[in-house]
Every structure is written in C-alpha cells, then in structure tokens.
Amino acid sequence: MRRVGSAVALVAVLLSMLLASLLIWPRSGTVVPADAVVVPSGDPGARLERALQLMARNVAPTLVLDGTPDFARVDELCRGGVAFEVVCLRPEPDSTRNEARALGRLGKDRGWRRVILVTSSVHVSRAGLLFRRCFKGEVVTVGVAVLRSVGIRDAVRALAHEAGGLAHGSVVRRC
C-alpha cells in the first residue's frame, strides 16, 4: 500500500512538472524577420504591447489581430492610420482553433512563410500547437508573462483552461 502511495505521489509530481514546463515556462522562439506578427484574442494588454514593440523593430510588415471590438487600442489599430498594415480577423465562433484556421487561410492567400505568434506565456503551448497545424509555414512563439498581474483564482482558472485545451488539442489532431 505504501508503494502505491509513493507511486501516485511521484506521478503527481511528474505531471505537475510537465504542466509547469508547458504552461508556466514554455519555450519562446528567437525573434527573426517574419511576414506577420499575430496576436490572438483575449485581453490584449501586455501581448499587444509586445507585438507593437516588435512592429517598431520592423520584424514584420503586417500585424494580425483578433478584431474583437471590446478593446479600445485594438479598435484603434483596426481602423488604420499606423505605419504598418493591420489585418483584423473576426473568426466565428471566436476560439484559438478558429483564429488558427483564419490565419492559415490568410497566410496561404498571401504566400507567407513565417509568422510570430505573441500570446500569454500560459497560452503559448496550446496556441502554438494549433497555429502550427493550420499555418503551413513556420510559427515562432513569443510568450508574455501575464499570470503575475492576475489574482490566484484567475491564474488557476487560466492554467486549468489551458491544460484542458492542450489535452483536447493533443487528441483532436485536425486544424
């Protein structure tokens, strides 16, 4: 009985370490020139700021945003008037998978070979998985730390959502 308890504890620790490596400390790619910088939906906050920093460094000529009309800065960028092209997507229903599908179509139409996906660090693994399935070029992921700026309840909720989404994305293998 004692061995079973030890084995269960070991599995729990290993699973926790795996989830932490995938959701809390995911790998981000090296930022290199690309065809577009992409910011998926959700509260854009720090992700949008990081994307705008990349655009200011001229790493890509196009910024792709989820055009959800709930965020003033996103609305402003979608109206244009900036030094780079902004493409605003509105996939229905709004989901990471549908955003990845929309980007896949857009990238195919435009002949893109590489995009930089800027999202929260907790979302990098799942979003990267889905965008790589739907976009036929290279997807470089850039994670932005956001869990430090939210409460414990929201952080746990976000981690649980991403863990479930990552499990679903691993089972449902289509774009």
Which residue ranges define each predicted feature?
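A structural signal for short, hydrophobic/glycine-enriched beta-strand patches
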Residues: 23-160
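Structural signal for membrane-spanning alpha-helices in multi-pass inner-membrane proteins
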Residues: 19-24, 169-173
